């Protein structure tokens, strides 16, 4: 909205042109989302308590997690509402990439909300059935990725970018693009959901990765930087840094209340949505492989569950004391805050490695 106002008001006073600057709007979006989240946090937490939207039991975790029972959940609504308001205020609403991100955000918010609501209403940790949840996620993802494919104006928008060689860019067919893109979004959504098992464990990696993807968006939107790094130049991709800024601001604000010991949990409405947002950003920017490096912690959490289930099914033996893997370390005697901070550190290192690959071409 402010970008449009800047365009209209610049004829009255050239000073209003500042509202069109990408850096100004990114900072504005970040600060707005941060302040909204911190200001609305206590009000939402009180409302969740009044509505009895509380963690009634431990879905996945050691016995020690029973003390967390009664903590308000569905705090992801705080993140999403601040993200949406800030994005609508500061982003260029004429940019189709922004609308794809907003569509994914709203679609997965509905799925996550219903999942949380059913768990609370029926006091059943299953919520939406696995098949229905996966089907819903797939429908939303396929819709978004199909839109990206059919509105692409350049082959770079539908190409797979590999690492270490500037010539390893391959245009994808319609089917492969839609299937691969949907897999990334759905997989990312569920990976973040699995990671969200300790206080603050999922939100800071989401913030850091959002920052990393925002830098890539800015680089791809700037012709000089894109040419220097030998990555495709997508002019309208730069606008995504404003959305990433809003994501970072709302995430930091939520961490204020979600850090150990948590006053509120994000619930599936938060984790499923945040994972999908990171996934769709990676798909839009065509840097899914770089994102996979950044999201190494999320992938490790997912693989630990897959390995555990497969091993028990075929060998009747468990590889880990408990999956996802953060619970394994809990049962090994690691204090919860130490696990959280170490996973944060690993994520930061992986993001630096991932960003370094952009120069190694």
Ranges and model annotations:
Residues 68-80, 132-140, 336-346:
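Select subsegments of transmembrane alpha-helices in polytopic membrane proteins
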Residues 141-145:
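Hydrophobic alpha-helical transmembrane segments of multi-pass inner membrane proteins, especially
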Residues 119-129, 160-172:
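Membrane interface segments of multi-pass transport proteins and intramembrane proteases
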Residues 75, 116, 268:
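Divalent metal-coordination and catalytic microenvironments
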Residues 57-71, 125-136, 326, 331:
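Juxtamembrane helix-capping/reentrant segments at transmembrane boundaries
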């Amino acid at each position: 909205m402010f970008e449009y106002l800047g365009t209209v008001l610049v004829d009255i006073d050239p000073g209003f042109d500042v509202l069109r600057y990408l850096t100004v709007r990114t900072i504005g979006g970040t600060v707005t989302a941060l302040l909204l989240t911190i200001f609305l946090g206590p009000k939402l937490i009180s409302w969740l308590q009044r509505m009895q939207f509380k963690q009634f039991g431990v879905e996945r975790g050691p016995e020690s997690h029973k003390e967390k029972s009664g903590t308000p959940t569905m705090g992801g609504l705080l993140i999403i509402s601040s993200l949406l308001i800030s994005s609508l205020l500061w982003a260029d609403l004429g940019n189709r990439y922004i609308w794809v991100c907003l569509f994914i955000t709203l679609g997965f918010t509905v799925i996550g909300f219903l999942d949380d609501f059913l768990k609370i209403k029926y006091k059943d940790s299953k919520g939406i059935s696995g098949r229905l949840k996966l089907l819903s996620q797939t429908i939303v993802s396929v819709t978004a990725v199909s839109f990206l494919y059919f509105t692409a104006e350049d082959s770079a928008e539908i190409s797979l970018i590999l690492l270490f060689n500037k010539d390893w860019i391959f245009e994808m067919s319609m089917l492969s693009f839609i299937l691969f893109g949907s897999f990334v979004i759905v997989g990312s959504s569920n990976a973040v959901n699995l990671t969200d098992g300790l206080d603050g464990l999922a939100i800071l990696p989401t913030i850091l990765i959002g920052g990393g993807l925002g830098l890539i968006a800015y680089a791809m939107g700037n012709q000089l930087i894109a040419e220097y790094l030998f990555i495709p130049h997508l002019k309208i991709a730069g606008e995504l840094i404003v959305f990433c800024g809003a994501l970072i601001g709302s995430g930091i604000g939520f961490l204020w209340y979600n850090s150990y010991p948590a006053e509120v949990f994000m619930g599936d409405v938060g984790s499923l949505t945040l994972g999908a947002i990171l996934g769709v950003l990676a798909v839009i920017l065509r840097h899914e492989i770089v994102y996979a490096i950044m999201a190494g912690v999320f992938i490790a959490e997912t693989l630990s569950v897959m390995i555990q289930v497969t091993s028990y099914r075929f060998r009747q033996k468990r590889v880990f004391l408990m999956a996802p893997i953060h619970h394994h370390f809990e049962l090994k005697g690691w204090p919860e805050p130490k696990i959280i901070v170490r996973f944060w550190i690993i994520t930061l290192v992986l993001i630096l490695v991932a960003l370094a690959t952009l120069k190694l071409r």
